[in-house]
């Protein structure tokens, strides 16, 4: 909670008065469902139509259409840029951010919707899979989704709309620069997407942020007595899809390499404590945990300027999983339902 508040304050510091989002009176490029005022629908139409100028962008909007998603603005999600909730079939965006940011947010979040349709996503979860398998899944999904946002923003730049690319490149150079370099050298989009995917792993602070969510989950669930191990190749084969085939041009086993599954000292310590408690309950140890390499995120020798700290925190917020926003919404909905049920029960008992 303290960390989230820190990022929220940092974003507020670096944000000027938000500019009004562009509006479009043109018909939607694809007939997705919109929710909101007439003005909000025109703003959403602009964002979606811009997305559809990119082939990759249109692909994920088609996924949203096929899965009956509703697009809307959500002003209650703090510094979160947006989220796609597969349970509620909603793609929500924060209207306080520029359209360029929201375009790459949609690309990232709806790429997750495509990933949710894979067998490996259904099979591999914290309840039944070992630590290494869960790390490979989460990281493959996030690296692929970020590489997808990179692809969409690049395609829009090529169509004469550079704002999304300029914003993405400034915020995520470790993803954008390898993409740009590989495309320039090879002319192969698959090579570029692979380079962007691998670039995701160069930000160790982001790795630690996602790992914290996994540790929190493992600390509160009752996982199976024996945890399954999955081959690295499956994560690439199923998550890195492009038209029925994997776009990934490197050895698929790399997702299980030290570079891709390393954890921070704190993460390994926390997981070891969790699995020590499991052992005391008679559950089998997870051999994959002991083999995980430990690599600490670098520490700045000199404190960064306040403006740099604020930007770094805001970018980190952009990379945060939107699960917290989704869970908060569901908790509010559950609480409201419980109040209604209690009121009805009280009425019937009179």
Each PLM stretch: what is its role?
Residues 100, 116-143:
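Post-HEXXH active-site segment of zinc metalloproteases
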Residues 180-311, 315-322, 326, 334, ...:
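Pan-zinc metallopeptidase signature
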Residues 22-89, 98-99, 288-302:
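Auxiliary, metal-adjacent structural segments of Zn-dependent hydrolase domains
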Residues 104-117:
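Active-site recognition of the HExxH zinc-binding catalytic motif
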Residues 91-106:
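Short pre-active-site segment immediately N-terminal to the catalytic Zn-binding motif
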Residues 43-46, 56, 101, 105, ...:
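Extracytoplasmic/secreted proteins, especially bacterial periplasmic and envelope-associated proteins
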Residues 132-210:
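Metalloprotease/metallohydrolase-associated module, dominated by Zn2+-dependent proteases
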